[in-house]
Amino acid sequence: MNTVRVTFLLVFVLAVSLGQADKDENRMEMQEKTEQGKSYLDFAENLLLQKLEELEAKLLEEDSEESRNSRQKRCIGEGVPCDENDPRCCSGLVCLKPTLHGIWYKSYYCHKK
């Protein structure tokens, strides 16, 4: 019985001491892998940053080429009174004289074409 205990204790001590060595080796391997992973991540990050900068430059060029006068000015929506001489109805609408309703306010309203 005593020899079994001594043998078990000896095996246990060896397992613990060798396990610690394996743990240190594993820690070193993990540090090396994380350093390699960081370098890969830095490389990928730099590539992504370059692509984003190129896209941003293209978008800024397109914005600078677009004129401010090319945008549609404020417009009047459907069913809103408009001026016959200066109709500012939104696209798809025309300034027409109403047939039945609206005769008591202004004589022209924006309606669908």
Curated annotation (Swiss-Prot):
Residues 22-74 form a propeptide. Keywords: Disulfide bond, Ion channel impairing toxin, Knottin, Secreted, Signal, Toxin. GO terms for cellular component: extracellular region. InterPro entries: Toxin_22. Coiled coil: none annotated. Disulfide bonds join C75-C90, C82-C95, C89-C110. Residues 1-21 form the signal peptide. GO terms for molecular function: sodium channel inhibitor activity; toxin activity. The keyword Signal applies. Expressed by the venom gland. It holds the Pfam family Toxin_22. It comes from the Eukaryota. Residues 61-83 are annotated as: Disordered. It is found in: Secreted. The presence of a 'disulfide through disulfide knot' structurally defines this protein as a knottin. Belongs to the neurotoxin 14 (magi-1) family. 01 (HNTX-16) subfamily. Probable ion channel inhibitor. This is U11-theraphotoxin-Hhn1r.
